[in-house]
Amino acid sequence: MKKIGIGLLTLPLAATTFATTPIPDVSPASEGQHVFINIPQQRLFIYTDGQLTKAYPVAVGKSMTQTTLGEHKIGVKAFNPTWHIPLSIQKERGDGVKSVPPGPKNPLGPVFVRLGDPKLGLGIHGTNTPASVPGIRSHGCVRMKSPDALEFATTITTGSPAYVIYQMASLNEDANKNLWLAAYRDPYNKKNLNTDALRKSIAAWAKANGKNINSKRIDAILKARTGTANCLTCAKGAKLTMPLKSLAWTNGSSVYSKPKFMPKPVPVQNDVLPAGSEIEVNADDFVPDKAASATFVPSNTPASDTQNHSRKPAGSTYTTTPIPENSEPTEVLF
């Protein structure tokens, strides 16, 4: 097998929909698919032809095992992967086990999608511990709830660009021309939040739209960093209305973030490994409870994905059932 709460009007972030999730200041490609993963926000975004189409909660690398920032590409996909345990973790375990087959004990969940150069050892994958998502707790991989991981894997195309970014704030205008600010904690201690640029962007927007914004409200949001979206201009009881537009605040601008013109990408066939292929990445060996083990069924490779270039062995079949929610642990071990 091949290895590979401060007195402000706030809006809680949605778990699985982009409808109420603050969006980052990014310039996605005008053509094709584009993935952005914002570490402080613990969210993954998919843009299609310059428009946001999906957003998911994710768990990312811990401060000691950080998810590599920068530009990557979506690589090979493996459904029902076998986890090939790295030598370092084999030594820690000391039980002679070298791999974990597909199933409820497999920390990769039902699917693994390579992220970037294989030498980085990174991937976007499911989990046997759904309670660990979102969070800052992986060995560097991007972890999704398994149903989300399956949807992601069948949506994204091999070769699509994927950027891991580090934005500690989101500044969005809603459909009612209200301005919303969210601030996030600094898990990697980057200390890269440019508050001067952020305040400049807010001030420029307020002037252009004839709004008054209380600077103390901004101060409170930036100090608390709750990760919730806070309205800077709303009357009491106002609700966020769609669609959202991100301001290009990282440059201190009041204009909207815009897609970056790119030529239409050359179609690339999805590269799908045979079911059960070994994947060697740093993951953690968490064993779910017996109920989860009894009800787990492997995932399938969707027949509707006509662009798949599958290396699936002849005669192999797949079935699908998500990992049950009752497998969530009370303590995350990775």
Model-derived features with residue positions:
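Short, Lys/Arg- and Gly-enriched loop/turn segments at beta-strand edges
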Residues: 170-177
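Positively charged n-region of N-terminal signal peptides that target proteins for export
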Residues: 1-4
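Gly/Pro-biased beta-strand-loop elements
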Residues: 21-132, 151-154, 160, 179-279
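Short beta-strand-centered segments at strand-helix junctions
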Residues: 138-155
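Bacterial N-terminal signal peptides
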Residues: 7-16
